């Protein structure tokens, strides 16, 4: 579901990702996601517009917008958070990456 954060079932450098695909678009067996990385891994100088900071529990994460990818639904694990309240920030990061706006 769009803007939900899920665990990643497979071995990966990323443990979490946010589903950014519209729920009205059906791509059988796949979803568009943006992985999350610990905020500690990125300098504060890195753009917060392109790589928004999100908080899940007591941890800070950065959305790795430039690593957005289509993944099989079979790798989508447990839902751990809902980022619907950050919808505008997420959309703005995607717009910035693709259209520079």
Swiss-Prot record:
What does the UniProt record report as the effect of altering residue 101 to R in this chain?
Loss of toxicity
Q: Does the keyword Repressor apply?
A: yes
Which molecular-function annotations from GO does this UniProt entry contain?
A: DNA topoisomerase type II (double strand cut, ATP-hydrolyzing) inhibitor activity
GO CC annotations on file: toxin-antitoxin complex; transcription repressor complex
What is the top-level taxon of the source organism?
A: Bacteria
Disulfide-bonded cysteines: none
Q: Which UniProt keywords apply?
A: Plasmid, Repressor, Toxin-antitoxin system, Transcription, Transcription regulation
Quote the SUPFAM superfamilies the UniProt record gives: Cell growth inhibitor/plasmid maintenance toxic component
Give GO BP annotations, semicolon-separated.
negative regulation of DNA-templated DNA replication; negative regulation of DNA-templated transcription; plasmid maintenance
Mutation effect (residue 100 to E/R): Loss of toxicity, no decrease in protein stability. Still represses ccdAB operon, still forms complex with CcdA
Quaternary form? Homodimer. Forms a complex with GyrA, probably a tetramer GyrA(2)CcdB(2), in which GyrA is inactive. Forms a complex with antitoxin CcdA; there are both high- and low-affinity binding sites for CcdA such that both CcdA-CcdB(2) and CcdA(2)CcdB(2) complexes can form. The CcdA-CcdB(2) trimer is sufficient for rejuvenation, whereas maximal operon repression occurs with CcdA(2)CcdB(2). When the CcdA:CcdB ratio is lower than 1, a CcdA(2)-CcdB(4) complex is formed which is devoid of repression activity. In this case repression is alleviated and both proteins are produced.
Which protein family is it in?
A: Belongs to the CcdB toxin family.
Q: What is this protein called?
A: Toxin CcdB
Please state the gene responsible for encoding this protein. ccdB
């Amino acid at each position: 579901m769009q803007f939900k954060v899920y665990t990643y079932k497979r071995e990966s450098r990323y443990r979490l990702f946010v589903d950014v695909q519209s729920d009205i678009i059906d791509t059988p067996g796949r979803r568009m996601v943006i992985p999350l990385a610990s905020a500690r891994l990125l300098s504060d100088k890195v753009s917060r517009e392109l790589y928004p900071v999100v908080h899940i529990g007591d941890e800070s994460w950065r959305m790795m917008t430039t690593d957005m990818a289509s993944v099989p639904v079979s790798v989508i694990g447990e839902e751990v958070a809902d980022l619907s309240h950050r919808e505008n920030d997420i959309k703005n990061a995607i717009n910035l990456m693709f259209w520079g706006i």
